[in-house]
């Protein structure tokens, strides 16, 4: 207690109370505490002490009452409910204590006489309560079903009940005796009585088999009751210990009532009675001493015979004489309650169950409050006592009109199942929650035995693939001498090494070609309606080899000069009309960029194409993107026509180009191969007609066809967000026909076609197979490469669009997730430098290409965080996001929306605009390098030779000659003798003649002094250098 503060657990020690009891008192006094380690003020502690004293006083009296009363819940509740007769309770308690004295005596006759006297007094004091007690016992039977094992016990008691027809006086006497004995025996050795009663219960069921069936049907699962009996003795002894447990007491309470019932049947067979009586001193007689001792179950059997007469088990229909017997039997139980706090709760629950038997509606309500008040045992006892008398009254009223045996059995059976779930459910609800939590934590992915890797992966991605913690991988590599961070890329050999350490086989799988055709656009139903369609031709090749020039040359030759506007430059898809064999035919061209960043766009072009035209410059030959284009076309399985461009240049060598192409499986026809190669000049227009004829020839061989009489299907070639038009997508129809007004779904973008524009800027209402059109009306910008489809049902299309959008959102969240391990790793390494970027481009393909290039920049120490990548204008929303996150906005071939530039100036947001991807990548790489910590580099200054040594005081000075460079005072020096370094330090003193010098250049002599080194020798070489900071660079990973 420091500074007037007291902790709950200290107060509990002081008051000799359990923490839970003290917390319950705090809750009653409205004192806010969270746990036993919470602190409270001294004033609050005083109020708790006062409440605890009152509670102790009430508990003491209640315990005495319980000891005296034969049945814990019945006696206490009866007195509490029948407030006018509280003195009766005291008298009954005194009588119960007397039976304890009788326990010592083993003779049945004296016990019977004492019991009769006590019964008479108790009946005179409170005749009504006995009947209610009997009825509560019957409800207890229904509750017993919670424990299945005791079923046999319950059944056996029922059989004995029928044969047992003894005088009421006899039953009463044994009841008292049994009650008294169990009290004594249970107190000295609670564990033994529990164990012994269990076997006893099992034995009786075997004797009464026929009646057992009936009883089981009636009670449902009365067998549990015997188990409850055994528990009661335990609980009496454990009362103080078990107080915190609420669920168990509930079960014990329900079980106590069934135990008494079992005692009733056991009365017939003397042996079962003796077994059960172990806890409660049963006499050898067949009398029902077990029934009186609820724990022992001896007294209950005595009362059962009369009950059986009026109402099957005598639960409801008991005679007035039987009621007193029951009272006597119940009286023995209260002592047990006094012993165990849990038993009080159990008996209270039993009383509630009895009430439930009387009225089914009350059952659930009773149990719930008990569970809520788990920690307030004594309060519960008082409250339960009050409620129990009410139950007794109800049972008495019901008992007056005895019900038929069958009806009683049915009610008991129904009551039992209902009550048992309540007690069971209360106890199991917490367990279920714990089990669920355990299952959630235990749900771990099993470590795979084999994984396939297609390329480098980050530590985090590898950890997810191998189902291990990323810190485990960092630890493994650290033990191998490699210090890596969570976000560092690991190459395949390193991944294999990690897999070997974890005993996981790592296979290197070939990455799936992006250009491979995934979806077959023509379905089985289209086969009977196929018609010839124009070929789709993709022009591919290296940068600056003349692809776009070649396409422009073809169009200028074949397109009327006055056509409006020509092409919308973003589309990259155009159609050309030519005359071949006297027929007018069309060819659709797709133009792809040649820069290395546009790999995905080239792959997309190859995937949707029918023929690939490979443009190679005659003066440059095969280049990296040429090789990539060949691999895309081969992966897509499309024929290749080679156009050798720039043959008009002086350095053109078409044959050398053909020779280089043979290394990649492209052998010209004139050399015996199958590849068509046409030398052309895009600028002069040479051999363009030959090239077009060859394209049509290859198309005829391929027999290209589609079904125009169906809903359109195809691929999104390009997409962007237009300021005036909204989402604009360039679609290539590969099968079917697209009409204005069609319901279109492209990826997760849903919409209705509002307008279509062809490559020449004309609005069209219909677009057939192989045509490329710009479509307006989509709700969102689809991703380039997505497949689109037309639906007849708008509802179906919307549902599918919503599902796809949800999946995309989930994948984005998973990619952007930050784990605790990554955060801790960043903390250990110091703050991880990040460059936040917002990227806006003119079209989706450009954005995709830029993101792909940025991913190639190594990000071990600095990282690029793409907050937003989208096609469209730079808007005020982008400016707000950048201002909030400290991001830089990158615009590629795009513009500002109205007000965005002003907002950027006001917010101080850095906006960079580019139209060349090379420059953009270089600037971002430079910004990342600027975030890197500069490294210290050794910069040599000069070399000096020692030619003389002059002793000065205790040290020495070297007379030196500067051979090269210069010497600077306070620079770092390294002294070498015979090629070995003998000293490294700082040059402390530098003199020229007798004056201090700041530096001495080559060709001059000087004196050198070093405070910590005096062992100079002629011929030593002094190397001077200084440490300078150098900007670090990042190399792009290829």
Curated annotation (Swiss-Prot):
Domain tr-type G: 532-705
Task of the protein: One of the essential components for the initiation of protein synthesis. Protects formylmethionyl-tRNA from spontaneous hydrolysis and promotes its binding to the 30S ribosomal subunits. Also involved in the hydrolysis of GTP during the formation of the 70S ribosomal complex.
High-level lineage: Bacteria, Bacillati, Cyanobacteriota, Cyanophyceae, Nostocales
Region (G1): 541-548
InterPro entries: EF-G-like_DII, IF2_II, IF2_N, P-loop_NTPase, Small_GTP-bd, T_Tr_GTP-bd_dom, TF_IF2_bacterial-like, TIF_IF2
Matching CDD domains: IF2_eIF5B (cd01887), IF2_mtIF2_II (cd03702), mtIF2_IVc (cd03692)
Comp. bias intervals (Basic and acidic residues): 178-197, 226-243, 431-450
Any Pfam family: EF-G_D2
HAMAP family per record: IF_2_B (MF_00100_B)
A single Gene Ontology CC term: cytosol
Protein name: Translation initiation factor IF-2
Start and end residues of each stretch annotated as G2: 566-570
Family label: Belongs to the TRAFAC class translation factor GTPase superfamily. Classic translation factor GTPase family. IF-2 subfamily.
Species in which this protein is naturally found: Trichormus variabilis (strain ATCC 29413 / PCC 7937)
Subcellular location: Cytoplasm
